[in-house]
Amino acid sequence: MGKYINPFTDWGFKRLFGQEFSKPLLISFLNDLLVDELHVKDLTFRDKELLPPTKDQRGIICDVYCETDTGERFIVEMQNRWQPNFLDRTICYTCRSILDQVDKGRAESEDAYKFLPVYTICFMNYMPRTDEVSKFRTDIVLADKDTKMQVSNKIRFIYLALPLFKNKAEECVTDFEKWIYVLKHMEALSRMPFTAQKEIFKQLEDYADSHRLTKKEWEAYENSLWVVRDNMACMAAAEREAREKGHAEGRAEGRAEGRAEGRAEGRAEGRVEGRAEEKKAIARNLLAMGLTIEQVAQGSGLPIEEVKSLQ
């Protein structure tokens, strides 16, 4: 096990962002995420009965009421686990959070539909599908299609695809970039960077230090860690199956065309390229699971240097 916990296990995520003692971490992260937009002064964790009612939703959402230094209030939902139909689910969870605020007993009243804005922040610690997001940070707001002008601040989605964040430690300029670097690489770090530049990273180091966990905390963390690895393994298997099916269909089509056109060389190149891309996809998922460079190289069949280039 590494020196620091994996922040994307349910237990690790809750320890760093979902506890009263770690509120300063969450406030600092939100302020760096939304820098130059608003400044969170305080936050309150929402009542447990307001959290998702079904088993597959629990553990993936951290719900908080936030208040800015200008008196504005809004709700933040933070999600950190992949699920099927991920984007659709985030929309449903956000709409649920809005509907929970509507006073159903006063539906005819104008005040019944005055609700706090809901910001949904999603950590995607896996390679996004091509039909989801294509860059590290994707901000979605309600805006006019033609003018691009925002028409309401009531709903906002921020998707953070960590595998698409490529900055090295020395390339991180903003505090937000430093946060993302630390969270992405935390489990593999031997020391916490940026502690001399910002005090909050010293607090993060204290709470994330795996050697400070009690026996009970360690057992809970270890169980949560296995859940993450099982989920990642299932994702990798599903993607591998889909690729193999696609490659088989492509090879069959290529053979048919090759017989007709004599393109044996093209078929061979296609098979080689397909296998190479499959190995890279497997390596990316293994990296997202927190495995070491050597373990990923062994599991994917790629050279160590090529695995390093995928980080």
Label for each model-derived stretch:
Residues M1-L225:
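Conserved single-residue anchors adjacent to enzymatic active/cofactor-binding motifs
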Residues G2, F74-Q79, I180-Q311:
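Short, charged alpha-helical interaction segments and adjacent helix-coil junctions
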